[in-house]
A protein has these predicted regions:
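Short, Lys/Arg-rich flexible segments
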Residues: 1-138
Length: 138
């Protein structure tokens, strides 16, 4: 399942002293942080299974560290996101085979909607990022 999240980073950059590139990175990193934070965890495998690719969907990580806090995963995603340039597509994906069952539910499991919930809040997350950027500038 591919979901597109489009945020007008140029409009955000115009309201800020930051460059478009910086706003692009910060908004994308905040979205990645939010989806990792919203990911349910028991052992941390699902949170640790998030990965990022630029311009083309890639293949899941060969080995995954359990990451109940999500901190290592967010750092790994952020490192890749900072390589992106304006115009790149950033794919944030989860390689755990059971992720879709938790996201959408089954006849035995209620849906958790951790991805869809984050996508639905993307505009609010971008506004919060802008507010944080502006606060740093003052």
């Amino acid at each position: 399942m591919v979901r597109n999240v489009t945020v007008d980073a140029a409009a955000i950059a115009r309201k800020s002293k930051r460059t478009l590139q910086t706003v692009f990175h910060e908004v994308t990193m905040d979205l990645a942080f939010e989806v990792v934070k919203a990911t349910p965890w028991k052992t941390g495998f699902l949170r640790g299974s998030w990965f990022t690719e630029l311009n083309n969907p890639g293949t899941p990580l060969a080995s995954v560290e359990e990451d109940p806090s999500g901190a290592y995963t967010v750092a790994r995603l952020s490192a890749k996101i900072t390589e992106a340039r304006i115009g790149d597509r950033i794919y944030v994906m989860n390689g755990a085979k059971y992720a879709k069952f938790l996201e959408h539910g089954t006849q035995h499991i209620a849906p958790r909607a951790f991805v869809r919930g984050t996508v639905n809040r993307a505009g609010a997350i971008a506004k919060r990022t802008l507010a944080r950027i502006k606060a740093k500038e003052t």
